[in-house]
Amino acid sequence: MTNKVQILSVTALGNLDAYIRIANLWPMLSIKEEKLLTKRLRYHDDLDAAKTLILSHLRFVIHISRNYSGYGLLQADLIQEGNIGLMKAVRRFNPDIGVRLVSFAVHWIKSEIHEYVLRNWRIVKVATTKSQRKLFFNLRKNKKRLGWFNQEEIEIVARELGVSSEDVREMESRMSAQDITFNPFPEEDLKDGKINGNMFYLQDKTSNFANGLEQDNWNKHTTSKLSNALLRLDERSRNIIRARWLDKKEKNTLQKIANNYGISAERVRQLEKNAMKKLKIAIEN
């Protein structure tokens, strides 16, 4: 796919800010739109569908790339690597498995960025085993202060990451070395420890990016449907719902609203109940 589908490129634009602005202009896909496009790609090899899927997910690659800003590498390069992972994910995604594409793609995006960081950071052969790679990406986020870990902190990190205390101390020493220059480790040196971006992916236990994005998308979707549903109500019913449920400062009482409209509190309750039924139907449809 990477040879056939041309997508937005940081290099082509020559400006990272311009790239980010343009990437964010592409509309996000609804569940229905995404499913239609992924099926067109999977069952009909529709490259136009693939292009739309990729372009609509570029913003997620940008978001993920920012988590790797502490390694001294250009964000533009991290984004390009993440885009490769995104394209691989789009090609391999099965629309029938019941999850959103972004949930599936996070693994591939992080995997490509991880491999790029490991190959291009300043330390020679800083992480050649699975436990070392895990430490490489997680060690600095576990540091609560500058300086070396004490023994208690070493044991805590080792326990949380499932590695030995000796591995933690060795990796801390490697990452603290200032006089070691970069020299990408050759493939023949890795042997069984070869980094495989398609198979290895470090989980960030502090957050779930995919779930967060899906929740954010759902919140925006629900808010939009609620706004449209409110417009279908008459003005008085709309104002009652807003006063009772949408006022951020306070929830108005039935009696206060009744006084404003010169009607009984019971009548306000009836209007509120009817309006809520109409909103429920409008949102569900």
Curated annotation (Swiss-Prot):
HAMAP family, per the entry: Sigma70_RpoH
Sequence motif Interaction with polymerase core subunit RpoC, location on chain: 77-80
Keyword Cytoplasm: yes
Organism: Buchnera aphidicola subsp. Schizaphis graminum (strain Sg)
Key words of the record: Cytoplasm, DNA-binding, Sigma factor, Stress response, Transcription, Transcription regulation
Protein's job: Sigma factors are initiation factors that promote the attachment of RNA polymerase to specific initiation sites and are then released. This sigma factor is involved in regulation of expression of heat shock genes.
Residue ranges of the region described as Sigma-70 factor domain-4: 229-281
DNA-binding region extent: 254-273
Family assignment from sequence similarity: Belongs to the sigma-70 factor family. RpoH subfamily.
Chain positions covered by the region annotation Sigma-70 factor domain-2: 53-122
Record text on subunit structure and interactions: Interacts with the RNA polymerase core enzyme.
Protein name as catalogued: RNA polymerase sigma factor RpoH
GO molecular function, one term: DNA binding
Cellular component terms (Gene Ontology): cytoplasm
Subcellular location: Cytoplasm
GO-annotated biological processes: DNA-templated transcription initiation; response to heat
